[in-house]
Amino acid sequence: MKSNWNYPTTMWVGKDRIKDLSNACKTLNINKPLLVTDNGLAKSQIVIDVLNNLKENGILVELYSNVIGNPTGTNVTEGADYYNKNSCDGVIAFGGGSGLDVGKAIAFMSGQTLPIWDFEDVGDNWTKADSQKIAPIIAVPTTAGTGSEAGRASVILNEETGVKNIIFHPKFLPSIVILDPVLTVGLPPKITAATGMDALAHNLEAYCAPGYHPMADGIALEGMRIINDWLLEAVNNGSNVEARQNMLTAASMGSTAFQKGLGAIHSLSHPVNALNNIHHGLSNAIFMPYVLTFNKDVIEKKIIKICDYLELNDCSFDGFINWILDLRKKLDMPHKLSEVIDEKDFDLDRLSKMALADPSTGGNPKKLTEADMKIMYQHSMSGKLFK
């Protein structure tokens, strides 16, 4: 299944393509990359082998491994300082969504003078950047979920405000992506499931977002079909390289498709990820049926089209909801937010305000108010779907 793609960027796909990483560096004239990853991966044999292979091929790689889950502005600033201190000339963003997001943001911020928050994805903020001082990026995902390797943004937590900000620039899109399923074979079932549901949320919300974008719609539909065919297999048989390859592909497709927009699944998720430190894929999985049933009157026709494309037994809105609920059950995922967040730690008013202000809110099929966010949170906590 090895192949080379040129959309949405250069993507080298297939088993053992990680061995081409030094060639990717040479293709981009990167002689001294900074490999950005988390501390756990940095100690793994995968990263040890990658670093050795790069050095054997004359690439003078440096390592930054302080990335944390739900990464912060401090992560980015520290990494950018390390990049400049060591005179690096490119970034290898290596890992799950956090490693990829921080790596991309380090490449971006290494040459900027304004603070990172000035580049939040609002209006034309991205035009404030000096685009000539953005380092080249190679992305190597080790999970199949965020699709950050195919995206033009990073999600970074502002520690002062407690808000997860989407930082955007067209040059966040990596120049080369390596999709090697072997790197995801060791993922535990729970992480495989959560990241897979993140990929589903991306494809699903992109398809349901309003606006005319047949290209994104087509990619999103096929992404959902791949997830339907392969997610359970990837979870139940993690050594199945074909399943892992397909899930990596579906994740990249989701990120490509959501250029069209996202929606309330993500709007509700980002605040609980920031304030309650809940895994993003897990929160997306929890919120999914509540948001879908809330939006039912404006998305029902689209949902039926998805059912038809996925060849579900029950091609109706309720049939699709039952498919989601059944999938979550098979993945051993919670039905209610209260199963992962204690009521005393749940600041409904603050979360609702943050959700409404989230950039993803604009892509929701139905215009939303703070009261809408509040009631969706309440239903998610109680486990009661909207009728």
Segment roles from a protein language model:
Residues 1-64, 385-387:
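An N-terminal, well-structured beta->alpha segment
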Residues 10, 32-34, 61-62, 89-92, ...:
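Structural motif
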Residues 42-115, 233-244:
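N-terminal small/polar loop signature for handling phosphorylated ligands or for N-terminal nucleophile
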Residues 74-179:
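Glycine/threonine-rich beta-strand-loop-alpha-helix active-site module
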Residues 152-260, 371:
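Carboxylate- and glycine-rich phosphate/diphosphate-binding segment that chelates Mg2+/Mn2+
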Residues 262-319:
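C-terminal catalytic subdomain
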Residues 303, 307, 311-387:
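C-terminal charged capping/lid subdomain of soluble metabolic enzymes
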